[in-house]
Amino acid sequence: MKIIGCMVVVFALAGCRQVPAHGYVPVSQYDPRRDADKDINDAIAEAHRTGKRVLLETGGEWCKWCHIMDKYFKDHPKLAELRDRNYITVKINFSEENLNEKVLSRYPKIPGYPHIFILDIDGKVLQSQNTGELEEGQGYNLDKFTAFLTGWARRVEAPKS
């Protein structure tokens, strides 16, 4: 009977979604039903906790280049690792279903999609990046994208002796 009880517990736990211990759940999909303001505030709180910067990626499921960027990160795991090591990434939906006008009005005008904003740990805009400048052919330029992510990553000063 103990074996059956243990098996029930194991199977029940196997179905549980793992949530990080600190409670932050990354926003990795464009979703018109999400509360973008809350998502950004949660990311800023996580940035405070981790010392990372916030990378807002605005776009939508309708956006061809948004899908190209997603695939580019999947195809270039070291670039994705660089992003994830230095940034709390939040996808902000912009679509007919939800323009997120109130939230996006706080940021510089967006010339095209996808568009990236880099925020400091207090939510201040450090960079508004037209991703067209990172493109090459039907994809992105690895050197340019790497330089962009590296250049805006937070620098931690070495302790003074």
Where is each model-derived feature located?
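Sec-dependent signal peptide recognition
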Residues: 1-7
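C-terminal motif of bacterial Sec signal peptides marking the signal peptidase cleavage site
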Residues: 14-15
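Thiol-based oxidoreductase modules, predominantly thioredoxin-like and allied folds used
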Residues: 34, 79-99
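A short beta-strand-turn-helix
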Residues: 35-53
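Short active-site neighborhood of thiol/selenol oxidoreductases, capturing the structured segment around
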Residues: 50-64
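Typically the conserved alpha-helix immediately C-terminal to a functionally engaged Cys/Sec
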Residues: 67-82
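Structural alpha/beta surface segment adjacent to cysteine/selenocysteine redox centers
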Residues: 98-111
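Non-catalytic, surface beta->alpha helical segment in thiol-disulfide oxidoreductase systems
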Residues: 110-159
